[in-house]
């Protein structure tokens, strides 16, 4: 009798060990996935780090001694949050402060350095791709799709597709990356809310939704 009990304990402990290993394995897998995404992003767009500013970057950074709010650094953030996106002569439109906020923070750290700003764009795009991967995985789980190729191949295609070149390689277009990333984060949190029915999930959901809107108005289109 004691032998049977001991065998059962061994089986239970073995099962518990496997269950305890799963979170660690999942965490390791997530790290590997993100690092692979980061590697592919830098292979595809890494040459943009050597680029200078382009003409459109003048909307978000101080070029040719233009008096822009971002050149005030962190101290200019309150004014950025209460200003239009573009306030030129006869042209005033848009409200998308979050991209400018990131540029103001960067200016406080290293002032105008296009190479580091391009580097930040690549990191943000890698995060964007990883969030999209999590979204695809959630959709695959919802529809019981077990073929991992249907999840990973679209991600690979998304990274290397040339349509993203302008967004990733233009510092001004960081707002597009931020907008989509915050929307993906909001959707992933909504899935959590829909599963667990815990109201407090709605708080980060609303925060990320508003951050997407503050990145670019098209978040609500």
Question: Positions of the model-derived regions?
Answer:
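Polytopic membrane enzymes that build or remodel cell-surface glycoconjugates and lipids
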Residues: 2-221
């Amino acid at each position: 009798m004691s032998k049977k009990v001991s065998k059962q304990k061994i089986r239970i402990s073995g099962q518990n060990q496997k269950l305890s290993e799963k979170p660690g394995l999942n965490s390791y897998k997530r790290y590997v996935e993100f690092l692979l995404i980061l590697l592919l992003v830098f292979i595809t767009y890494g040459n943009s780090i050597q680029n200078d500013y382009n003409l459109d970057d003048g909307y978000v950074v101080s070029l040719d001694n233009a008096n822009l709010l971002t050149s005030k650094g962190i101290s200019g953030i309150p004014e950025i949050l209460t200003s239009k996106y573009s306030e030129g002569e006869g042209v005033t439109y848009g409200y998308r402060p979050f991209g400018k906020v990131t540029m103001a923070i960067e200016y406080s750290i290293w002032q105008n350095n296009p190479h580091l700003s391009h580097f930040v764009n690549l990191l943000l795009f890698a995060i964007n791709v990883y969030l999209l991967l999590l979204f695809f995985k959630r959709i695959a789980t919802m529809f019981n799709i077990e073929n991992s190729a249907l999840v990973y191949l679209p991600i690979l295609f998304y990274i290397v597709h040339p349509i993203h070149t302008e967004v990733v390689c233009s510092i001004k277009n960081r707002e597009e990356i931020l907008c989509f990333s915050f929307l993906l984060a909001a959707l992933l949190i909504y899935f959590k809310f829909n599963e667990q029915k815990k109201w407090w999930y709605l708080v980060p959901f609303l925060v990320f939704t508003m951050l997407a809107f503050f990145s670019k108005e098209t978040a609500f289109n």
